[in-house]
Curated annotation (Swiss-Prot):
NCBIfam families according to UniProt: ilvD, PRK12448.1
Family, per entry: Belongs to the IlvD/Edd family.
GO biological process: isoleucine biosynthetic process; L-valine biosynthetic process
Lineage top rank: taxon: Bacteria
Name of the protein in its database record: Dihydroxy-acid dehydratase
InterPro entries attached to this UniProt entry: Dihydro-acid_dehy_C, DihydroxyA_deHydtase, DiOHA_6PGluconate_deHydtase_CS, ILV_EDD_C, ILV_EDD_N, IlvD/EDD_N
Amino acid sequence: MPKYRSFTTTQGRNMSGARSLWRATGMTEKDFTKPIIAVVNSFSQFVPGHIHLQEVGKLICGEIQKSGGVAKEFNTIAIDDGIAMGHSGMLYSLPSRELIADSIEYVVNAHCADAMICISNCDKITPGMLMASLRLNIPSVFISGGPMEAGKIQKNNKTIKIDLVDAIINGGKSHISDDFIKDIEASACPTCGSCSGMFTANSMNCLTEAIGLALPGNGTLLATHIDRKNLFIKSAQIIVKITEDYYKKNNTNVLPRNIANKESFENAMMLDIAMGGSTNTILHLLAAAQEAKVDFKMSNINKLSKKIPHICKVAPSTSLYHVEDVHRAGGVMGILGELNRFNLLHKNTRNILQLNLEETLDEYDIFSTNNPDVINMFQAGPGGIRTTKAYSQNFRWTRLDYDRKNGCIRSCKHAYSQDGGLAILYGNLAKNGCIIKTAGIDAKNYIFSGVAKVYESQEEAASSILNGEIISGDIIVIRYEGPKGGPGMQEMLYPTTYLKSMNLDKTCALITDGRFSGGTSGISIGHISPEAANKGIIALVKNGDIININIPERTIHLNITEKELSHRILQEESKGPLSYKPHSRKRYISSALKAYAFFSTSADQGAVRDYKKISNI
């Protein structure tokens, strides 16, 4: 039977000093026999997805205490990718994932916490916490702050839904009035919560639900709705229960690595493909799988992408639906339920409820459940009131979206396409693979050829787009923006969004060894591996080259001869120390970012640290 880890600091005469310090935090004699549960919060006044989490932390701590645990809260950092976007701040976003994972390991291991509950929400915070939980492998529960309500504006006497991406698109249109832009800007992000589309934050919160480390509703129940409070309370109760199950009953099934096994990762990826989630999720799942010691690679994702239909299309891939609409249609469990009816899922994976997936779907799929509380939860909708307060409104839809032919979630029979919403492409330009969100592309553009225009920074590319230097048929190549070359693998939301501003998003493509925001759509291919800084072929592309993209065949090809390619390699290598480095770019790189670049692997490995380098230190 495992002993509480915390007994290292709470038991025995030689720990009297530690107990004295614990007492100074408010603990009493009775607390020294209870499990110490780390409440890993990510509250921040910088981030709308995290602005409400201070109150959430207090609620969860109180419930843990009531349930028989000792709650000890600490904070991680949190970067808002939307605010950091389009300038040097984005260099820090992806590296913060590793910093978050490390900081959790430091605090939890230094204080010998027995378990942890992770209060996350936005882009790099959820994956950083996920990596930490799988690394530490102690009882863990995830609960996100919840998605933001969609923004709304009046246009042509109609109310239309908008989000952050709409604000960026219109900001890049020179003919749009300042007053209209201000109206959109003031309306796009009306409440606390993670941005309202199926961007990276909401995608990751949906995936933790599918993996089994978060409760049903985690990914889609609005931050502002009163039902979210119930989810926080239940999550706090469950972390105490599974902690006691592990330490008092030796139930190892509740440990993160036993929940997040290979089949669970595949279920999560199948969900991701079915809903056309953010391409960043692939990066984060690959990283998390390495922490879990699970053999899950790009090749596994490629196989899944060919058999999973695309059954849910949400902003930015459509303006019709946001995450609040996914919730009304049954949420993550609704999407998984449709995949399950086509026998596509691993049904024996288990979760923090200690149910297998089949049992969970029986209870939480709106087409299967007999539980009125479940139906009631999925009726939770937007209040339409600007607020930064958590669980502050109680609006409910009178009926759910059961339309599986034309609704927000479709059946596999009525899928948008039988080929999923994400795809992996290979070719001489990406020998180790690259990623495209097919959910955001018109079928007529699945096969695309164009002329390369090469840039060595996203700033340079964005400027060219706005200055009218890009024309239909161009393929913008942005290189040296990978994990090592950036460093930090910036998101290219501004260039792709400016293509929309210039009405070029359907007639141009953009490829990069960087990555994309979850808000990106169009012919946008990222994560090209190897990256330019790792001697990838993208470093050898020249202006005027023809690039061929074929999504049905899963290929991307630089249309030059092998002889020419060999010549370019020799040409680049002749530059000596200056080879495979950007030459036209001026960028300050801090020592922290240099350290990240030194240890980072390419995107096909999740942009995690190269442990071979670490082992040689």
